[in-house]
């Protein structure tokens, strides 16, 4: 647990340009979101794992409400739930991507993108009944998101014509020729997962490489 807390503290100081970018390729066009890795590591790690496994390929934006949000990722069977993760600096404003859920700590794979500011969905704002963790923001192609938001739907908010995620891919992976040393001639002490448990290198899984000079690198090996 101490390792996990330390990871959160260390990653809170990482610059924005180190954060993961994800490309959505849909039948309406393409857009990119940038994840808040350092602020909500559990949520982003869960999303990255799903993306890396191809979980969302062929999934639909199955719920669309104009001037509100577009929701996707309803794939069966759903993965295990994750703990809600909130940061006071994040809010459900226009362009942000957030976890969909049916109550506290019930999020799994479904998410939505805010078409407008929906700050009442924040954990720390009235009416305090809806709590949806923000974990990223659309950085390009938001016009495509808006186009999806304008599709015709039935009375259940389901698009008449399927809006398909043809593929969803990590677009900003870091690669290293030598994972066991860094540019400062430091040595690798251990590799841990998002929960701080010591492990060994896995493919398509976010891991944290801890070096003897105190540096921590998040690496996803392909």
Cite the ranges covered by each PLM segment.
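Bacterial Sec-dependent N-terminal signal peptides
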Residues: 1-20
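Short loop/turn microsegments at loop-to-beta-strand junctions
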Residues: 20, 186-188, 205
């Amino acid at each position: 647990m101490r390792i996990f807390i330390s990871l959160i503290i260390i990653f809170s100081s990482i610059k924005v340009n180190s954060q993961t970018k994800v490309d959505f390729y849909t039948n309406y066009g393409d857009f990119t979101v940038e994840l808040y890795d350092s602020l909500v590591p559990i949520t982003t790690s869960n999303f990255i794992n799903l993306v890396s496994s191809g979980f969302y390929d062929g999934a639909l934006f199955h719920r669309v409400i104009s001037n509100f949000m577009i929701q996707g990722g309803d794939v069966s069977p759903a993965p295990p739930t994750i703990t809600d993760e909130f940061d006071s600096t994040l809010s459900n404003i226009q362009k942000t991507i957030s976890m969909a859920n049916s109550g506290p700590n019930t999020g799994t794979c479904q998410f939505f993108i805010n078409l407008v500011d929906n700050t009442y969905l924040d954990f720390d704002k009235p009416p305090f009944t809806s709590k949806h963790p923000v974990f990223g923001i659309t950085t390009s192609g938001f016009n495509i998101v808006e186009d999806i938001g304008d599709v015709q739907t039935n009375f259940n908010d389901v698009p008449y014509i399927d809006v398909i995620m043809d593929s969803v891919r990590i677009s900003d992976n870091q690669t290293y020729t030598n994972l066991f040393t860094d540019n400062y001639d430091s040595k690798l002490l251990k590799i841990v997962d998002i929960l701080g448990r010591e492990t060994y290198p896995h493919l398509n899984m976010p891991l944290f490489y801890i070096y003897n000079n105190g540096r921590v690198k998040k690496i996803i090996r392909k």
